[in-house]
Design a protein with these regions (language model features):
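Cytochrome P450
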Residues: 1-409
Length: 409
């Protein structure tokens, strides 16, 4: 447990970094850091990397390991955070070789382009179903009505859940999404988080037991088969790999849809261009630009396994690097006119899916979800318009998304 002095330093640093003003527009601060302090050691002992080249080096260098969750001991005590840490230590994103290699090989099999292509009819059905529910109203909150439930319902089908269970999945994500940015949440959601984790564990344990007897073509069945081969070594790996797949695949896709749609409305030329050419290639190019321009995930973390030289500085063994993906994506040394939304941008190698050994496994699924969501919304709602020109952003440390996005059509 860290000392009260350390807790105070953390609280002061975080309150300055992650207030409402920062959440509304973090990019001026990113520019300042990139220009003046591109590799900065903070008062709480974390290094901040904001240049594209440095971020790529950290992500690709295998000496930088998955973030050591014990570093969270430096943050003020939070029962919800503690419960999440205990669960997520089993998730692939916080594992290192050989466990990471074993788990990634398993998960990559299911999220391959061929498998995801087969999911497209169901993903399209979910998008149409959600829009059917709001079409007669003439208005909607894109976040509440579409962007929030859409990826949850897709992932529930990926897992092999019944339609009747989807509302329960949505409730879990409302609860478990809170401690993903624990240092800025107003209250400690410990009781609710513990209960949600217990419910998730029970649900996926029961679903796995059913799939052992009655396998299907879903992710839980693949995990059960892997368990039989020894590729999954514990019940915790199965349960919490499923839980983290939900968490990682939900929040990021929700933010991609919300952030991207807001970017279109604030750049009417881009919106007009996409409406005139809604081809899959055009939408896919636009999606990459949405991801670069306003990344759903702003930061990721790595831990040095040994002393590592980075841009003339030494990152000591055991210290942590905060890789600011959102800052790297606006680096003028890598991107021409980085603060401009250009949905035809060539050579758009953004870092919103991170990179290296821990590059996002769900990238293919996320892009298919995004393409179907934008194509369907723009096709079915040609008069779509922004109802609130200044929607509120959720205050957050690592994720960037809107609280709501009211639209009329």
């Amino acid at each position: 447990m860290a000392s009260p002095t350390t807790f105070a330093k953390v609280s002061r640093f975080v309150s300055r970094m992650y207030g409402r003003l920062f959440s509304a527009n973090p990019y001026p601060l990113y520019k300042f850091l990139r220009t003046r302090y591109p590799l900065l050691r903070t008062p709480i002992g974390f290094w901040i990397a904001t240049r594209y080249a440095d971020c790529v080096d950290v992500l690709r260098d295998k000496r930088f390991l998955a973030f050591d969750l014990r570093a969270l001991d430096a943050f003020p005590p939070d029962d919800g955070l503690k419960s999440m840490r205990e669960a997520l230590q089993h998730a692939i994103v916080f594992r290192n070789p050989p466990d990471h290699t074993r788990l990634r090989r398993l998960m990559t099999t299911f999220f391959s382009p061929g498998v995801v292509d087969g999911l497209q009819p169901r993903i399209q059905h979910i998008a149409d179903y959600l829009l059917d529910a709001v079409e007669a109203r003439g208005s909607m909150d894109l976040i509440k009505d579409v962007a929030f439930p859409f990826p949850i319902d897709v992932l529930a089908e990926v897992m092999g859940a019944d339609d009747a269970d989807k509302p329960m999945f949505r409730d879990w994500m409302r609860t478990l999404g809170v401690p993903l940015d624990p240092v800025i949440s107003a209250n400690d959601p410990g009781v609710e988080v513990r209960q949600a984790i217990a419910d998730v564990r029970r649900y996926f344990s029961d679903l796995a037991a059913d799939r052992r007897m009655h396998p299907r073509e879903d992710l839980i069945s693949i995990m059960v088969a892997a368990e039989g081969r020894g590729d999954l070594q514990t019940e915790e790996e199965l349960v919490f790999s499923a839980m983290f797949t939900l968490l990682a695949g939900h929040e990021t896709t929700m933010n991609m849809i919300g952030n991207g749609m807001l970017a279109l409305f604030r750049n009417p030329d881009a919106l007009a261009r996409l409406r005139s050419d809604p081809s899959p290639a055009a939408i896919e190019s636009a999606l990459d630009e949405f991801l670069r321009f306003d990344s759903p995930v702003q930061v990721t973390f790595r831990t040095a396994s040994e002393d590592i030289e980075l841009s003339g500085r030494t990152i000591p063994r055991g210290e942590h690097v905060v890789v600011f993906l959102g800052a790297a994506n606006r680096d003028p040394l890598r991107f021409t006119d980085p603060d401009k939304l250009d949905i035809t941008r060539p050579d758009n190698h953004h870092l919103s899916f991170a990179g290296g050994p821990h590059r996002c496994i769900g990238e293919v699924l996320a892009k298919v979800e995004g393409r179907i969501a934008f194509e369907t919304i723009l096709r079915r709602m040609p008069k779509l318009a922004l109802a609130d020109p200044n929607p509120k952003w959720r205050p957050a440390m690592s994720l960037r998304g809107l609280e709501s996005l009211p639209l009329t059509f």
